[in-house]
Swiss-Prot record:
Gene Ontology process terms (BP): translation
PANTHER family: 30S RIBOSOMAL PROTEIN S10 FAMILY MEMBER (PTHR11700)
GO function term, MF aspect, one: tRNA binding
Protein species of origin: Korarchaeum cryptofilum (strain OPF8)
Function: Involved in the binding of tRNA to the ribosomes.
UniProt KW Ribonucleoprotein keyword: yes
NCBIfam families assigned to the protein according to its UniProt record, in alphabetical order: uS10_euk_arch
Keywords: Ribonucleoprotein, Ribosomal protein
Protein family membership: Belongs to the universal ribosomal protein uS10 family.
SUPFAM superfamilies reported in the protein's UniProt record: Ribosomal protein S10
Subunit structure and binding partners: Part of the 30S ribosomal subunit.
Protein name per UniProt: Small ribosomal subunit protein uS10
Statement: the UniProt record of this protein carries the keyword Electron transport: no
């Protein structure tokens, strides 16, 4: 039975997300571990519309705010223990959240 190590990266900054996913892929290439990904998932957009004027008068008086959440998935079939230990030592930027699951 094959095990799959799934790494899910989430960030609002796409540049730092790409940098971290590149680091995971480079470590896997150095150790000779096979990697599937990074697979980009659809970007979630959180939108908030707020009325500028509290009195309610005026037509085009709205502020629109948007937050985009980017996700990447990296799958590693049959992960090596050395690879798992080496990715645990990576320092991540503050805006990148990571989830590691062994399936």
């Amino acid at each position: 039975m094959t095990e799959i190590l799934r790494i899910e990266l989430v960030s609002v900054n796409p540049e730092s997300l790409e940098k971290v996913s590149r680091m995971f892929k480079e470590i896997a290439d150095k150790m000779g571990v096979r990697v599937k990904g990074p697979i980009p998932l659809p970007t979630k957009r959180l939108r908030v519309t707020a009325l500028r004027n509290p009195s309610g008068e005026g037509t085009n008086r709205y502020d629109k705010y948007e937050l985009r959440i980017h996700k990447r998935i990296i799958d590693i079939p049959n992960p090596d223990e050395r690879y798992i230990r080496s990715i645990m030592g990576i320092t991540l930027p503050d805006d990148v959240k990571i989830s590691i699951v062994l399936m």
